[in-house]
Amino acid sequence: MPQGKPSVVPDDGLTTRQRRQRALVVVHTGEMKGKSTAAFGLALRAWNQGWPIVVYQFVKSAKWKTGEEAALRALDRLHAETGEGAPVTWHKMGEGWSWIARPGTEADHAANAREGWAQVKRDLAAQKYGFYVRDEFTYPF
């Protein structure tokens, strides 16, 4: 393990700080639990760095209360009161979805997914945020 010095220094003309600030796309995939938890853990780190955060939840209904939403909304309030961290914007894109299909709901889910993805594209084009969480966006597609 290197002791504070990289074994190879990239010849890209960038400083270490510039390399650390580059945009990344991180995709968590796999079966079972942990993907959303990992994404929200990264969102906490982004908040601490002062990066404005946006969350798009494609599956969970606005009626459903979740711990991750409560925590990040509390951090958004803390930011508004103290200036610490960063603002957090939250979009719930669906009416709720489950593995049990109800007849007549497929079109609604598809329309919500299309509108949700259009919102993501608008926000990406505007470069409004420093950190984007697209939670469970592959399911509706």
Residue ranges and their predicted role:
Residues Y139-F141:
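Conserved ATPase-coupling elements of RecA-like P-loop NTPase cores
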Residues M1-V25:
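Extreme N-terminal, non-catalytic leader segments
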Residues A23-A125:
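Conserved P-loop
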Residues D135-F137:
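Walker B catalytic acidic pair
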Residues K128-F131:
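Loop/turn-to-beta-strand initiation segments
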